[in-house]
Every structure is written in C-alpha cells, then in structure tokens.
Amino acid sequence: MKRLIMTLLLAACMTAAGAKDKVGATIGCDFVGQYIWRGQKLGNVSLQPTLGIDYKGISLSSWGSVGFDSDDAKELDFTLAYELKGFNVGLTDYWFSEGNYFNYKAHQTTHVWEANVGYDFGFLSVQWFTNFAGNDGLNRSGKRAYSSYFEIVAPFRLAKLDWTATFGAVPYATTSYDANGFCVTNISLRATKDFIIKQKWHLPVFAGLTGNPRAEKLYIIFGTSFSI
C-alpha cells in the first residue's frame, strides 16, 4: 500500500508541468459549535486552525482542533496532497493528544496514517480513504482493519446560499467507525453564506445537519471561517 501511494504521488508530480508555477499559502481558522467528522462527534465547541502551502498542484498543510472543553482531545494533522484536473491523491498523518507525539512504536502510537484518492467532476466529487498504518481499528477477527470510508459530495447553489449534500459510508467492519460491516455513517446537508465586509474581507458562516444512521444520531452544526 505504501509503495502504491508513493508511486502515485511521484507520477503526479512528474506531470505537473502545466499547473500554476507560483507558491501559494493559506492561513485560516474555523470556529465550530461542535466537531463532527464523517458522522462522528469528536468534540464540542472548537477552534480549528489551518496552515498550508501549495506549488504546481502539490500541497502540504497542517490542521488542528482545540476544544474549549478540557475533556476534548487535541488533534494535529498533516496532509501531503496532489491535484490535477479534478484528480487528487493524498497522505494524512492524524495525531490525537492521548499519546506522545514522537512515539511511533507499533501498538503504542496514537498516530494514524491514511491514504486517499478521489475525483472532482464539478457537479459531484467522490473520495476513498483507507488507513494503512498506525493506530488503526480492528476487524471482526481482531486484526488490523485497514479502516476505510468513502464519500460523495454534491455542491449546489440555492436561494443565494452555497450548499453541499454529503453521503458517506464505511465499506466493511472496523472498530474505528464502530462498524460491523457496510454501514452509512454520514448524511449531511450544509449551507454557507459568505458575508463581504468593506468589499474586501470575507466572513463565511455555515450551518447544517449531519445524520449518522449507524449510530442513530443527528447533529446540528454551525460555525464560521476566517482565512487570509
């Protein structure tokens, strides 16, 4: 799996000649009423900063989540990704604060390494994610599950708002998603309104609903984003 992902990344980099040749950077932060990820609640009110750079379709970004509740786990993720004409592939290192950051020992680390591949058709995007190393969940045999998740997202515009409809599911058993087999874990609808301040500052505000049929949960989400 590792060799396949690295081969895809190297091949993608070699075909990037026609992409933008300027280095870009992103700094931003989301403020969310509760931290919902792939249909699972991972925290309450949280700040979620991000920092990234990109060059010729290749990007390296960091993302974190810090909850206001002392019981919420702190999270720090790094993602290396490549995108070309709708196709995208990436590697993400997830880390949660229950363990030491520089502990990479097998069966001890709290890092999770995930690979993803997807395609954006414009009117619809599809993504597949698979854990390939680290603190992965277990299958029904008690072995590494290579926990996976796939997602379909459809953006549209209605009533002067930008909407996204999301369908996400887990294809097979894993304790990471509390799944005994194929199950739907994420059905979401979200609307975003971009407020423009003094004709140059943007303040997107979003709200929506996320349902997790597997867990029989329904969440309301609300937040805002800041970026420069």
Sequence positions of predicted segments:
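Short loop/turn motifs that connect adjacent beta-strands in outer-membrane beta-barrel proteins
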Residues: 19-24, 86, 154-164, 192-205, ...
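Detector for outer-membrane/organellar transmembrane beta-barrel domains
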Residues: 106-174
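Outer-membrane beta-barrel "beta-signal"
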Residues: 154, 189, 195, 216-228
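Residues that define the transmembrane beta-barrel architecture of outer-membrane proteins
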Residues: 23, 43-47, 72-76, 109-113, ...
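Outer-membrane beta-barrel initiation region
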Residues: 20-54
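Outer membrane beta-barrel transmembrane domains
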Residues: 162-197
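Transmembrane beta-strand segments that form the barrel wall of outer-membrane beta-barrel proteins
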Residues: 27-35, 57-68, 89-101, 124-136, ...
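Cleavable N-terminal export/targeting peptides
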Residues: 1-24
